[in-house]
Amino acid sequence: MLAFCRSSLKSKKYFIILLALAAIAGLGTHAAWSSNGLPRIDNKTLARLAQQHPVVVLFRHAERCDRSTNQCLSDKTGITVKGTQDARELGNAFSADIPDFNLYSSNTVRTIQSATWFSAGKKLTVDKRFLQCGNEIYSAIKDLQRKAPDKNIVIFTHNHCLTYIAKDKRDATFKPDYLDGLVMHVEKGKVYLDGEFVNH
């Protein structure tokens, strides 16, 4: 595990911080590392990270209406009623530890609805850059961070974006379920993947 961290994290200071947080997480009931090799970051660990620097959390949208037998909220391209409940539950837990953040989503009905139910009234900014994912997603994240360098950022996006980031940054195979997330941060103009967000 130590060798993996040393090869993945270029900042000595951040390496020490993440090791300490992983050790703290390991004392709990959940493993500190996911089976895909990504560190597991729960709400409390995320709050500690946010004390060190602003965090960027990317979530996959909630349950899609067009791929479920559950009742749709409204538009068939949006999310289900169950999806709204799951997003609200996640948002309540998240906001209890990270109350201050800027909120973004891609320009699809399902991500907009997910972000709206997650935030319970927080201002949402729709940004089409979070629909198509490749290296350009890092430029978009850095752009948001430059505009508000001291703010945490939450982005609702899509499974292919999260899969791309995990593979590109840590060579990890990540197949996110609805509302699964990744935790990142920007340091000295570079975007780093810290781990997988787990809502426990």
From Swiss-Prot:
InterPro entries: His_Pase_superF_clade-1, His_PPase_superfam, LipoPS_heptP_Pase. Pathway: Bacterial outer membrane biogenesis; lipopolysaccharide metabolism. Residues 1-25 form the signal peptide. The keyword Signal applies. It is found in: Periplasm. SUPFAM superfamilies: Phosphoglycerate mutase-like. It is an enzyme of class 3 (hydrolase). GO terms for biological process: lipopolysaccharide metabolic process. Keywords: Hydrolase, Periplasm, Signal. One of its GO terms (molecular function) is phosphatase activity. GO terms for cellular component: periplasmic space. CDD domains: HP. It comes from the Bacteria. Its EC number is 3.1.3.-. Catalyzes the dephosphorylation of heptose(II) of the outer membrane lipopolysaccharide core. Belongs to the phosphoglycerate mutase family. Ais subfamily. This is Lipopolysaccharide core heptose(II)-phosphate phosphatase. The lineage of its organism: Bacteria, Pseudomonadati, Pseudomonadota, Gammaproteobacteria, Enterobacterales.
